[in-house]
Amino acid sequence: MRLSKPVLLSVSLVLAAPAFAQNVAVIRFPELQKRLARPTDTTYVVNFWATWCAPCVKELTNFEQLRLTNAGKKVKVLLVSLDYASQLDKKVRPFVKQRGLKAEVLLLDEPDPNAWIDKVDTKWSGALPFTLIFNNKTKQRTTYERELSATELTAALKKFQ
């Protein structure tokens, strides 16, 4: 049986989409730090979370909603999981797939949080959830060490626009 190129392309895209949507990259802090230091006019909304953190899980839909609302704008939602790297295939990827998260998800592979937390924000105690919103071009920056509602998240982002 011979399939046409458009049919093959369509089937390939359908099969590849779920795998792409669930891609979770494992990174170290220096790599994350470089990404956060880029001199762009994009506003970044970076949420530090974990699958075992109930308030984190509850607010993830708010970040997805924010991502969708700001599609096409210079706003980037980045979800940074603090689960253990050993849990990537057992917990994190299945969790991301089950929740239908489409924002970029990174798993931060750093065994000692005390070595990097102050580099994200000196006022951060290390508690989750933690959200950092910043724009390097305008030098605006704000942080939240608590769960954010959709309304609070939208209002926080509006201060950057």
Predicted regions and their residues:
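Thiol-/selenol-based redox modules, centered on thioredoxin-like
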Residues: 130-161
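Bacterial N-terminal signal peptides
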Residues: 10-16
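Structural microenvironment flanking redox-active thiols in thiol-disulfide oxidoreductases
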Residues: 60-99, 113-117
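Conserved redox-active cysteine motifs that mediate thiol-disulfide chemistry
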Residues: 48-62
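A short beta-strand-turn-helix
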Residues: 23-43, 67
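Short pre-active-site segment immediately N-terminal to redox-active cysteine/selenocysteine motifs
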Residues: 42-44, 49-52, 84, 127
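Sec/Tat signal peptide C-region and signal peptidase I cleavage site
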Residues: 17-21
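Short, internal strand/loop/helix patches
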Residues: 95-128
